[in-house]
């Protein structure tokens, strides 16, 4: 459903601790300071601006001599994070003269009762913020909807498939618009949950990307950044509430089965005792990253005798092995890939096999369809 934020107001019977003139209406979740609406807006927007400036989020577009290269896409979903992001980016772009052309980029995954409704909110945001809007669908890009993916692969795999497909869809949308930078509404809660997920899975190597403010991929030329990296979800909800922003508040139909939900519940309990638990977790993840880089430098130093014999396309990995850097193209869709198939096409190939197998039981020519499907796939 589409609604304005209805966050319950916190009763605070004192003056704002910043301006000392207006009545405080909240205790800021991050540090429990009592603030009025105006001061909360100011500190929220200033902290986002500081994140942008300190991490040079738009250095690759702000300095461009060509206006068309100053475009930045906002990953829009109609939810609270992307709605607040669009509002704040518009405000900061005008206040600090970033000189950016902001564009809303929305992906329709094909989830009935969820995405079809949230798209209406995105269209409302387009009018309210006066930004161009581009919508791409899984069906048009992949000939699959997420509802079809779930019916074939099962609900427990939904986030795995959707994460890969959505990332590539955003890249394709940005390429279509001639944009090489996307901002997303990922916040401190999201980043902390990802750090914990990677720890629980024993995937230490992924922690580096999960704590980066700016990320890029060896398989894409599109750069991504997270202006809300240090802003909590609670504060984003408060901002939406006091700004009276309209957003789509229903959770994704398939998100309840995600393991991430267990991490979210744990953080929810911990934040009641330690409000800074999310940012603390992010900082801890960044320390892992620094340790990993130090180990890599040491390994490179230990292998200095071999270094002069290596071409520029070689890299010494932390375990001492040598990786060859190659720029490949997916044989199916043409996207940059480290293997013959990009991750999205590899997953889609598996789905096509499953769909063809299912047809064996329902149609007489199912076996022929399966054989034809297998012949068309490259692994």
From Swiss-Prot:
Transmembrane segments: none annotated. Its EC number is 2.7.7.-. Keywords: Cytoplasm, RNA-binding, Transferase, tRNA processing, tRNA-binding. Signal peptide: none annotated. One of its GO terms (biological process) is tRNA thio-modification. It is found in: Cytoplasm. One of its GO terms (cellular component) is cytosolic tRNA wobble base thiouridylase complex. Pathway: tRNA modification; 5-methoxycarbonylmethyl-2-thiouridine-tRNA biosynthesis. HAMAP family: CTU1 (MF_03053). PANTHER family: ATPASES OF THE PP SUPERFAMILY-RELATED, CYTOPLASMIC TRNA 2-THIOLATION PROTEIN 1. This is Cytoplasmic tRNA 2-thiolation protein 1. It comes from Lodderomyces elongisporus (strain ATCC 11503 / CBS 2605 / JCM 1781 / NBRC 1676 / NRRL YB-4239) (Yeast).
